[in-house]
């Protein structure tokens, strides 16, 4: 939701609608999706390399720790599926195209904002660790957030301009003006607080001598995500504005509305010159109703484990009863709501090679199994059973991309042998072994492979195996080693006994200013992240037959891209690991697992990736420009070269030979072959060490 231009108008220098508030010791209803977008985009975090999730986790932790220091009690509410009426669908499609274009622009070095794929999952995991109360609604959360805030008489934290329209007694705290990074202390009381700005709709309307009940009419006329009335919106409202107004259309409309005592009188005046009065009145009435607050369901959901009966009535009855609590708790992805309710799914574009099919193509088989569990089999709850004429097949419309254009395609839901006889209504009651076999078959993993992999590493390693087998173009060895080095970093950085010196040397400040990226590396890792995301969704639906990994420790984009760059510059893998270190031990464990899953011959036959060592340079700004990561490593070597032991520079060569294992390949839609990028440019090889 959102009223275009309203937030800017209220924050303009000529207005005085935001009042300073030393915020502390209150309940706070937080717009969760708005918050994680803000924390990601306002913290200068990596986006071009696919995200630095460990750094994002630290930002989220700091935010809630600062709230706690000020005795603020947060309640986080996250959006669920699309509205069952589909009244916002056109807006969502428009945003989909914009997000694709933003991802493309970022991939070619322009400054854009693209949310890394696993951001929401990491956000939810951090909230769980911190025991922050959180609810994921079944549909859009804005109305539920406002209703709860009014019921509990506490403010809302959000940047969504729709909360300027809701008549909330306790008002709105815009995230933009919520200075949480610097906790202040009241010298008189010695109490900590967060300096913020506070908006009250009643006081805003008072400045125009306008009835606050007219604000929903105002929002409906200007148009939000739900209501579009171009003939009424474009009536030259600026003629009612004051001279020198920073936004004459908004101010003029507010001045015009102030002459009416209430919504009915204003609507009558609006409709007089309108030809299609019935349709316009219907649109206005629906728009006004969207802002009418009555007690919702969130209070009961936050305070009780019991699911309110009313939340799954009507179209939402397609959701099996057992899925409701996991969805509300944020444990199960709201992705299933759109599949069951609308028979569609929207796939996020990432920083990838836009000349190739979407990186999400690699995870297609995983999604098809997911759709099969939701849509196939005997389901008493099945509401919309649309199928192609003459067949019993079920399809989901996937919205993705073809190059930089939004596209849609019917994707068949499939049923594997392990899924025979399974019903969605009773899926959670199936034995663990049955649910486990479904995800193992999907990822192409045998029982022998399962036994040889520690529980805590199973999901991430099986996803990596699936990626290596199914990704096109096939990942190179440097992609694999870079990914594993990132996991080593994540493991060590999350350990309380981590080698601090090693960690400080590996930290790289991500650059958002035209930062270079090797597009083949970005595409490969976007494919891996897509496989991980949809494997996590499948694992949730199957009630966690595999241990859920800590996503923040699995991928640090700036580091893995940096590692690939070092390998392509001639640094041997052994030289990146210090002999006898924890890093070497963990890397060897991960490498041994992958070799056992893939077979030694498969690894040896993979392309090295060194033939692309200069590929990224010709796709970015200038050939002579040195990457910030390269400069970082040069500085690191100057600092450490004098104190290094000669023994640590010895390159160790592994002579282990493993048998080739048969690799089941999952069916994937046909893709275009990647074009050759650049000829190989040999460069001088030299050795450096990253892990100490």
UniProtKB/Swiss-Prot annotation:
Keywords: Hydrolase. It comes from Danio rerio (Zebrafish). It is an enzyme of class 3 (hydrolase). This is Single-strand DNA endonuclease ASTE1. Structure-specific DNA endonuclease that specifically cleaves single-stranded DNA and 3' overhang DNA. InterPro entries: Asteroid (IPR026832), PIN-like_dom_sf (IPR029060). One of its GO terms (molecular function) is 3' overhang single-stranded DNA endodeoxyribonuclease activity. Belongs to the asteroid family. Its EC number is 3.1.-.-.
């Amino acid at each position: 939701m959102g009223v275009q231009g309203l937030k800017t108008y209220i924050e303009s220098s000529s207005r005085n609608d935001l009042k300073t508030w030393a915020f502390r010791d209150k309940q706070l209803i937080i717009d969760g999706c708005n918050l994680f977008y803000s924390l990601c985009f306002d913290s200068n975090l990596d986006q071009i390399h696919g995200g630095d999730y460990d750094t994002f986790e630290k930002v989220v932790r700091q935010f809630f720790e600062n709230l706690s220091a000020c005795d603020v009690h947060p309640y986080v509410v996250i959006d669920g599926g699309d509205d069952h009426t589909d009244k916002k669908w056109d807006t969502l499609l428009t945003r989909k195209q914009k997000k694709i274009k933003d991802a493309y622009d970022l991939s070619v070095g322009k400054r854009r904002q693209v949310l890394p794929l696993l951001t929401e999952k990491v956000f939810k995991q951090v909230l769980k660790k911190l025991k922050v109360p959180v609810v994921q609604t079944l549909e859009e959360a804005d109305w539920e957030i406002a209703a709860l805030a009014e019921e509990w008489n506490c403010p809302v934290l959000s940047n969504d301009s729709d909360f300027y329209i809701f008549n909330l007694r306790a008002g709105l705290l815009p995230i933009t003006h919520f200075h949480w990074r610097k906790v202040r202390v009241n010298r008189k009381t010695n109490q900590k607080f967060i300096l913020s700005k506070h908006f009250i709709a009643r006081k805003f309307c008072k400045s125009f001598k306008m009835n606050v009940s007219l604000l929903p009419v105002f929002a409906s006329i200007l148009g939000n995500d739900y209501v579009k009335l171009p003939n009424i919106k474009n009536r030259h409202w600026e003629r009612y504005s004051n001279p020198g107004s920073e936004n004459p259309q908004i101010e003029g409309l507010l001045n015009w509305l102030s002459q009416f005592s209430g919504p009915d009188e204003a609507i009558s005046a609006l409709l007089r010159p309108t030809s299609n009065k019935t349709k316009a009145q219907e649109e206005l009435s629906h728009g006004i109703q969207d802002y009418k607050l009555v007690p919702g369901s969130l209070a009961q959901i936050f305070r009780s484990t019991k699911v309110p009966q009313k939340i799954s009535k009507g179209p939402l009855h397609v959701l099996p009863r057992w899925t409701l609590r996991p969805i509300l708790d944020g444990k199960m992805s709201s992705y299933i709501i759109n599949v069951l309710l609308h028979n569609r799914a929207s796939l996020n574009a990432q920083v990838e090679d836009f000349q190739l099919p979407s990186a999400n193509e690699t995870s297609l088989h995983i999604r098809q199994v997911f759709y099969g569990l939701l849509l196939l089999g005997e389901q008493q709850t099945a509401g919309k059973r649309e199928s192609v004429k003459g067949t019993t097949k079920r399809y989901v419309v996937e919205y993705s991309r073809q190059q930089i254009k939004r596209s849609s395609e019917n994707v068949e839901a499939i049923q594997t042998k392990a899924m025979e006889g399974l019903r969605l209504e009773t899926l959670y009651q199936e034995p663990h072994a049955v649910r486990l076999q479904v995800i193992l078959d999907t990822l192409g993993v045998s029982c022998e492979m399962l036994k040889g992999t520690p529980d805590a590493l199973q999901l991430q390693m099986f996803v990596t195996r699936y990626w290596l087998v199914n990704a096109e173009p096939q990942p190179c060895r440097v992609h694999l080693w870079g990914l594993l080095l990132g996991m080593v970093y994540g493991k060590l950085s999350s350990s309380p006994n981590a080698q601090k010196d090693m960690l400080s040397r590996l930290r790289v400040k991500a650059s958002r200013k035209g930062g270079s990226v090797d597009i083949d590396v970005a595409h490969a890792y976007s494919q891996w992240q897509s496989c991980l995301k949809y494997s996590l969704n499948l694992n949730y639906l199957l009630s966690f037959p595999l241990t859920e990994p800590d996503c923040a420790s699995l991928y640090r984009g700036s580091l893995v891209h940096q590692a690939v760059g070092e390998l392509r510059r001639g640094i041997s893998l052994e030289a990146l690991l210090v002999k006898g270190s924890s890093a070497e031990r963990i890397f060897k464990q991960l490498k041994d697992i992958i070799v056992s899953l893939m077979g030694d011959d498969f690894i040896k036959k993979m392309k090295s990736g060194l033939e692309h060592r200069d590929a990224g340079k010709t796709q970015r700004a200038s050939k002579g420009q040195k990457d910030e990561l390269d400069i970082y490593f040069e500085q690191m070597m100057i600092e450490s070269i004098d104190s290094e032991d000669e023994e640590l520079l010895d390159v160790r060569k592994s002579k282990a030979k493993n048998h080739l294992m048969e690799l089941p390949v999952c069916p994937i839609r046909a893709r275009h072959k990647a074009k050759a990028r650049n000829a190989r440019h040999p460069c001088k090889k030299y050795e450096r060490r990253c892990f100490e």
